[in-house]
Amino acid sequence: MEIRHAQKQDIPRVMQFIKEHWSERHILANNRKFMEYQHVDRTDRFTYVIAEEDGEIYGVEGYISMNGEETPDICGALWKVIPCNYFMLGKSIREALMRLTKCRYMSSPGINMNTSGRVLGMYGQYVEKMDHYYRIRDLQEYRIAVIGDKTVRAAGSENSSGRLAYVSSFDEMERYLSEEYLKTKVPYKDKVYLRYRYFEHPIYEYDVYAIVQPKRRSFVIMREVSANQAKIGKIVDFIGEDEDLEGLSTAWDRLMEEKGYEFIDMYSYGIPERIMERSGFKKLEGEENIIPNYFEPFEAKNVDIYFVSNVLEGLHLYRGDGDQDRPSM
């Protein structure tokens, strides 16, 4: 069994493998343009590692580089092996991927806890669950969420002086971000990555807001989704200082009112719960409230997102990292 870094000429074979062994309708099995958007990096390299023998692929794992360093920070993406005589092939692919990319840090949101999560946890990787926070709008009827407990932190119960200012272009965002500052974050997402990921996406449209309190140094990245003739706002990434999120409850309420959202939610790891509470959010626990995550197709259920990583210190992960926030079909 040979485990190697894929080449661009392998794209059709990897797409066919995904179609046959993951899902016939998966976007990465059917849309080459999107496959190349997500998995051909700035050096024109196809970001997959494959395991093959006698011309047949037995396993693949994709990844996304978040900066252009020699030892980059990366996020794992689709990871799949099929039955064969090679013991622990999935683990071997992961080890080869980390070696071949020379990555500093690697995190993989969206792992299956019954398969890869359990295996990697046994071999020294950190396996954790992302926190799921939400703030609901006070409505008589909810068409997306199922709300049994409408308790929310009242706007103004903490200092609510923070404001959100819409950012219309990456050039505007870039004025407030230095590469040196971005390098202090784990993972390090450089300017090239941020522009490409959120301002040049071929299918999704993202809304970027600067937090103004008292100056602009932190940014919230959101995506609007709809179902059942209703809309919500997903926070998919956050760039900045955790404490800047405090005191935004009034700003969130104003945004929900302007946009007509039922709620705003956020999956994250690394932001202290006390800060999210002071921002007006509530941590989702139990099943009394249902804050759906799946919209393609829509599923009215709560979803836990687990991740595996080789680092936890300083780590901040969000739904937009890896391929958790991408079209499904």
Language-model-detected regions and their locations in the chain:
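Extreme N-terminal starter segment of soluble prokaryotic enzymes
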Residues: 1-3
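Acidic/polar helix N-cap motif
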Residues: 7-10, 82
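Secondary-structure boundary elements
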Residues: 54-55, 99-103
